[in-house]
């Protein structure tokens, strides 16, 4: 259950010093380069589960979707598709639990105004590890900076451990 609840909070890590542009939507900083996306997502996620998500809403385009993929013990793939508002409601139900996401490693591919980020992450709730996994993030460059168009997440499981090349 925790894996499903928190796997959306994937990505990020500290990329201090990344130049930021101002978002027209909520006054939140949008990354000026794709390498700033993980830190922007991390900053928007980290904190109390019931915190204001205005910066997360500014970072994702309104049509963005989040897909959470999991493998059953029998190896069967299942997925859940959510809007950002769906995710916010689900996470908010955790109350004041402190969420902290840390990026382990990431790789970026970019062509013009589109980018794809492949990111491994570790998620903690109230200081305790609850999930690790991989994020696949798609982004687009707009006038104010880079925004996320979609996030696909698969949390680590007994049948799909995180490969060593994605660990620190």
Language model region names:
Residues 132-160:
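Short beta-strand edge/turn micro-motifs at domain boundaries
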Residues 56, 64, 117, 139:
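Hydrophobic pocket/interface hotspot
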Residues 22, 65-66, 78-129:
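Surface-exposed, charged secondary-structure patches
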Residues 1-9:
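Bacterial N-terminal signal peptides that target proteins for export
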Residues 8-16:
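Bacterial N-terminal signal peptides
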Residues 60, 70, 119-121, 135, ...:
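A mature extracytoplasmic/lumenal domain signature
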